[in-house]
Regions:
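Preference for long, amphipathic alpha-helical scaffolds in soluble/luminal domains
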Residues: 2-4, 26-163
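N-terminal secretory signal peptides that target proteins for export/translocation
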Residues: 1-12
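Bacterial N-terminal signal peptides
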Residues: 14-26
Length: 163
């Protein structure tokens, strides 16, 4: 398979899985909508979301990144971490705690002195991935162990000053 096509295909799969998980997890808890609207889809959506999370967990590298060029940016691990969070998973417990923590550690490990979160293939430019990373870290702030919390508290102000 041609390398460019393969990279595009892997990126496309990741983006679809991440956004599918985020979309269905967020919509399942919508306020003011009768439960009957979602109940008929729940048996189809929940297993699909779980399969997506399992895929992301299996695909994650030991260092917290993901395969191919775009998976090494800070944006993809941040989006994947938010996908786990959107289904109610926590960095301190549960089947995906290790995956979430690897996402956190990867992002924190790739912050420059300027505050910029950048690693690997920047794709649309370094600010694209950078802007996703503080959103993820803001979401996990307060849910992590004290050491990670300290690192997040130090990293976020520097990151936000760039935006």
């Amino acid at each position: 398979m041609h390398r460019i096509f393969k990279e595009f295909r892997v990126r496309e799969i990741f983006v679809r899985v991440i956004f599918g998980v985020l979309l269905f997890s967020a919509s399942a808890g919508a306020q003011g909508v009768p439960k009957t609207v979602f109940s008929e889809w729940k048996t189809k959506v929940d297993p699909a979301v779980e399969r997506g999370l399992q895929f992301l967990a299996r695909a994650q590298e030991r260092n917290g990144s993901f395969p191919e060029n775009y998976g090494t940016s800070t944006g993809i691990p941040s989006l994947v971490g938010m996908a786990f969070l959107s289904k109610g998973h926590m960095p301190t417990e549960g089947p995906y705690a290790g995956n979430i923590n690897r996402c956190i550690d990867y992002v924190l490990q790739h912050q420059q002195r300027t505050g910029l979160f950048v690693a690997g293939h920047a794709g649309s430019g370094p600010m694209y991935a950078h802007n996703i990373s503080p959103l993820f870290l803001s979401e996990v702030s307060g849910m992590v162990d004290p050491e990670r919390q300290k690192r997040i508290a130090e990293a976020l102000p520097r990151a936000l000053n760039l935006i």
